[in-house]
Amino acid sequence: LVYQGIIYVTTHAATMAIDAKTGKQIWKTKVEYPAETPRIVCCGIINRGAAIHEGKIFRTTLDANVIALDAKTGKELWREKAADIKEGYSMTVAPLVADGVVLTGISGAEFGTRGFIDGWDPATGKHLWRTNTVPSPDEPGGDTWKGDTWKLGGGSTWITGSFDPESNTVYWGIGNPGPFNAAVRPGDNLYTCSVLALDPKTGKMKWHFQFSPNNPFDYDAVAEMVLADMTVEGKPTKVLMNANRNGYFYVLDRTNGKLLAANPYVKVNWASGIDMKTGRPIETDVTKDAREGKKVVVYPSILGGKNWEPMSFDPQTGLAYANTLSFGGHYKTEPATYKAGEWYVGMDLTDLWDWPADNGPRGDLKAIDPLTGKTKWEAPSDIPRFSGVLSTAGGVVFSGQLTGEFEAFDADSGKKLWQFQTGSGIEGQPVTWQQDGVQYVAVTSGYGGVYSLFAGDERLAKVPPGGSLWVFAVKN
């Protein structure tokens, strides 16, 4: 987060304010949490960033607290508890400020929790509203859950939503249902694997779209919702774009949730396509066999065609730029038994991956046509990139490698223009800003995250853990 010449950086253990021109630390505030907290966090002891509003910095903590700090001094101004870690909840999400409300999501779907989005008063920390992402039987959508399965239904909200101030609408992606074993929870399982359009003042839902009903493959839909104006069938249209974890690239009319396009952008075998009238996937025998308890090889894997790392859209080229994954996974259900604060997935986690033949590229930085899903160019990587992507008005695309290279590509051709070795894996989101007539680009470097935890990629064994901020000046 960069604001008025100051870079605000968060980790799981601290918040820092750094002078953007000199790199001098202005203040640092430590984050304390109970020692047992990391055991409850699914997929990385991390924090995804901060928000700023009226002189306050807002962030979340691993033990599911929302805090406000004085932007000038780092002094804690208020702290509110969103959920109980003993029940399996945690927080890594960056808050979003929309229409004078601080919005936060929650993690914990792998622990048998029930997801939600909260609204908070930025001045006092007062809790204003909560929108449950898994409805109870007396709420709209409650009939898509059988019995009491909704109580453990998942639907985490661990990636920040997008705000359209013109329509005063927040678009927030919802995670996978719990457990993975879909036989435990018959029905469509709303509003998991969906995008919700919300009024930020009240949390009231304007519309929803579900990408993957009754999903068994951990294809959560939390990844960024990119808002843009583009021409669709000859008409100017306000769209929402999502490179979904299920392998399909979706374009929706963001004013009403109507599906405009849905095409595969990576290899997909769990569905043969998307029904454009209903928006529902046309499932293959792979999905049917998985629900029946048979072991299958599924594409994409449970890490998806793209995971959390944000893509970027360039209105000049009309292309979306995304770090994608090109490997599949082995999937087989197991019985799911719930115990508070412990994993509740119902899946064999001992043999997860179906790697490309001959140890080929496991991921690609792709330039994708949003309306067709077709790739204009790609930059393969033996080890998949897990950083966010930044595209600039100058026609440059920035991304990073898990082995430490920070890279720049030509947005139109994909030609690599430059790279710099940062010394550790890059998994953060690059950011750019202009200050005193100079354009800067910054990125954090520090190896970790879901791929390092679960992939078992020995090629990363010698990558140092890192933990640094790099700032570069862009020269003509």
Question: For each predicted feature, which ranges?
Answer:
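Extracytoplasmic beta-rich repeat domains
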Residues: 1, 28-51, 76-94, 111, ...
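Loop/turn-rich, solvent-exposed surfaces of beta-rich toroidal or solenoidal domains
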Residues: 229, 325-326, 357-415
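Short, conserved, GDST-rich strand-edge loop motifs in beta-rich repeat architectures
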Residues: 104-116, 172-190, 326-358, 446-464
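Beta-propeller blade signature
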Residues: 69-74, 115-127, 188-204, 249-257, ...
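Residue-level signature of beta-propeller blades and closely related beta-rich strand-turn architectures
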Residues: 13, 63, 108, 176, ...
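Short coil/turn segments that connect the beta-strands within blades of beta-propeller domains
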Residues: 4-6, 54-55, 99-101, 166-168, ...
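Residue position within the beta-strands of beta-propeller blades
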Residues: 9, 59, 102-105, 172, ...
